[in-house]
Amino acid sequence: MSDPSVITRVDAPPTLEEAQEMVGGMVELVMLSDGDQMLVNEEGLLYGLPLNQKASEVANRHIVGNALILRGKAKWT
């Protein structure tokens, strides 16, 4: 398995289907301290997904699997 990735979107919010494809399953919304949002796999720990060090540092909490950061117009409302 490859290392988990962190992708940032600023142009437009992803659809639910796009977000699910990116994180590989059910989506969990994590609010970041700067007001941005991070989407992660809600069941990542159950699936044994690998630690995402970069996303964990950004979120200041343990994040596994792929993460999608939403900024500006890309935020979910």
Enumerate the language-model features and the residues they cover.
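Detector for the mature cores of small, proteolytically processed
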Residues: 1-77
